[in-house]
Amino acid sequence: MPRHLLIAFALVATLCSATFCPAKDRNKDKGKAKSTPLRSIHLDRAGKKWADKTLRKMSPEEEVGQLFSIWTRVQFLNDADPIFIQLSDSIRKYHVGSVVMSVPVDGPLLLRNQPYVAAELLNRLQKASKLPLIVAADFERGLSMRLYGTTVFPHAMAFSATGDAENAEAFGRISALEARAIGVHWNFFPDADVNSNPANPVINIRSFGEDPKQVGDFVAAYIRGAHEAGMLTTAKHFPGHGDTATDSHLGLAQVSGDHARLNAVELPPFERAISAGVDAVMVAHVTVPALDSDPTRVATTSKAIVTGLLKEDMGFKGVVVTDALDMAGLTRIYANDVGRAAVESFKAGNDVLIIPADLDASYRSMLQAVRSGEISRSRLDESVRKILELKASVGLNKARFADLSQLSREIAKPENVAVGQRIADEAITLVRDNGKVIPLQSSVNSVGTPEAALPYQSVPVVSNRLVAVIFSDDLRTDSGRMLERQILARVRDAHVIYVDSRSAAGMTPSVMQAIEGADHVIAALYVVPVAGRAIRTASGGVTNTVAVDDSMGALLNAILDRAADRTAVLAMGNPYVIQNFPAIQNYVCAFSNASVSETAAVKAVFGEIPIRGHLPVTIPGIASRGEGIERTAQSNAGGSNNVHP
């Protein structure tokens, strides 16, 4: 079977280790925290010596344990709390090498906590471990994904909508500074997937777009920024999850492209990541028939893909990590022996085994494979050495604890918070304005307050002149809360109505009554990819999180039937939703449901900021990649309507 040959950057890969390539000095970068000394990723002689010495002293039991990474969900835990006892006991009993920081979940809710709570818990876990733990996290939008009080950034697609890769570099730097402050060393980001399938239920706005070169540019920029501030990076989900129609958290996804397609679309961003010095590559639970014809071999367990393609053909020398081993895309194949999934993943060439479905079974299966000779001691040593050197490269051989006294100086610096908001502002993309309503125009009976932003003027309050309908993913979440605050700060009598899949049908009469006399309507669609989550529809079916529920879709269509020309639809996430609602006349993409994107969308709709974003993806039948209607700040509906490539 022919393999992808990597020539263009072979010399770079030889001269500069994929794991320890130093970041370049870029003094002109946006958002750089000049007052904070940056710590680079570097494996010095002392670190290498520590790794060698530590490895020589380790037993097979300890070495096997270093391969595993387990959840730690941030919350305050007393030392005697059963959750803390179980977590610390697992670290000691199984000698785990790393933990993945997340937060508890309650249905659709992520129970986020504060940075101090995270840092304090991670310090206690470090104390419980014989060897220093490397702490990883999914900070795809910065720490704000998991923790309150941190710098907020939008989803990846918003960055590419700005057209400026330096924004991704600033994001990498700022999120790295904050992560290292709380004791997190390794981010499972950037996402190198090319979102070429509009129906993709799990990647979508997590990707930088549909163009392999643009995705590669932003991937490389993020890596540079993160490395400048000492954060390990991960390119995911190899060999590409962007052209799939199944969430691998819920089922078995397939990448059906041939060799030519893989080489032209899926692989180039990973090549860019490797040449940029990415520290790790995460392998996806997807089948790729063009690379491995065995239907029971997902990429994670395929030696042809992990060792043959990634390591040998593409020359990657860094750490290879699995996607979570508890995902349905893998557990359904190994339902009768989940421990075997760990063994097969390791034999394929992975170094780190993340979130096993059953830690005890996986640990015992790996240990038995080593003792029986199925896995050689030299192969085990190879991976453990990589892991130890990775730890030393971020200084864990010298210091493993976060300095809690530094958190108030490093987290959410005003200048960094401003960078996050600026990026969200620059990402706003106007796709359609047939009704000439963007920005919203004042009328004879305009609404507002003396403090409201132009073009509204202060006049007596008149109810329902502006109606905002927030189509929430779930009313229990905070979706739409910042949008509501920003609207009411400008139009104090605006009528804000929340609906979700369970309430939309019952709310339809009151919504229709509200919009009847409205000058303008805002319909904000909160449709974002949530990995591993399926939604029960009102009709009893199941859909994914990037689709609009039937009942909410019916309500949106009813609004459009009555008031399409005066309704501004805001896509607070998935930009493709307009495909199912051709009656939309005025369409704005924010590419994220982050609070900064909510603020940016309101500022744009009210004409307070220029609209300069351009689509990073093609919306079939609607608009092509690169298109976007530009507006100057405080312009009126008669302003420029040109589409810019």
Outline where the language-model segments fall.
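Bacterial N-terminal signal peptides that target proteins for export
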Residues: 1-8
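Bacterial N-terminal signal peptides
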Residues: 8-17
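Preference for extracellular/luminal or secreted protein segments
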Residues: 23-89, 303, 312, 333-645
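Short, well-ordered alpha-helical
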Residues: 54, 62-135, 139-142, 193-206
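Second-shell residues forming the walls of enzyme active-site clefts
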Residues: 56-59, 83, 90, 109-129, ...
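Structural recognition of the beta-strand scaffold that forms the well-ordered cores
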Residues: 65-71, 97-102, 132-137, 141-143, ...
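Short acidic, glycine-rich surface-loop motifs adjacent to enzyme active sites
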Residues: 71, 90-112, 198-199, 274-297, ...
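A substrate-binding/cap region within the structured catalytic cores of diverse enzymes
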Residues: 161-184, 191-200, 204-206, 212, ...
